[in-house]
Regions:
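Acidic-leaning, charged glycine-interspersed low-complexity segments
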Residues: 78-122
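Short, conserved turn/kink motifs that form compact alpha/beta structural patches or helix kinks used as
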Residues: 42, 58-68, 95
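Small/polar-rich, solvent-exposed N-terminal microdomains that initiate assembly or binding
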Residues: 1-45, 67, 79-91
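Short amphipathic alpha-helices in soluble, non-transmembrane regions
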Residues: 68-74
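A generic structural signal for ordered secondary structure
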Residues: 10-14, 51, 59, 75-79, ...
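Oligomerization/assembly interface segments of phage tail-like spikes and tubes
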Residues: 48-65, 110-120
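Short, solvent-exposed beta-strand/turn "edge" segments of beta-rich domains on protein surfaces
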Residues: 44-47, 105-107
Length: 122
């Protein structure tokens, strides 16, 4: 089975997206960073299932946060045939036309998000 940690480690190993955390932003994390979280998934049918993920980025300037979000998208979009742990990723598709602006957090950092569908094979 795939885990958030698998994807976070994959992005870190590929040097994509800068500082990335699983699930949420830690209290002492830098202003410029991202999180990865599961949104939902589908049952496996014929050895294929889908996992829906959200990648949220933040930074003190909106252009920097949006760029980080787009950098991750450029790396993941239409990526095919790679392994996360022992699971094959058949295809990654971004579900948004552009990064969606969520507003500012309690420390005035700008937040953007993109949602992805990972088609997975057993």
């Amino acid at each position: 089975m795939i885990s958030i940690i698998d994807l976070v480690n994959y992005l870190k190993n590929e040097k994509v997206g800068g500082v990335i955390y699983p699930l949420s932003f830690p209290v002492n994390s830098p202003d410029a960073c991202s999180t990865v979280n599961f949104v939902s998934g589908t049952p496996t049918r014929g050895g294929v299932g889908k996992v829906y993920l959200q990648v949220m980025t933040r930074d003190v300037h909106p252009a920097k946060a949006e760029k980080a979000s787009n950098d991750i998208r450029s790396f993941l979009e239409k990526r095919t045939d790679f392994l996360l742990s022992d699971m094959q990723v058949i295809l990654v598709e971004c579900q948004n036309f552009a990064p969606f602006y969520l507003g500012m957090d309690e420390n005035n950092r700008h937040l953007f998000t993109l949602n992805y569908t990972f088609t997975m094979g057993e």
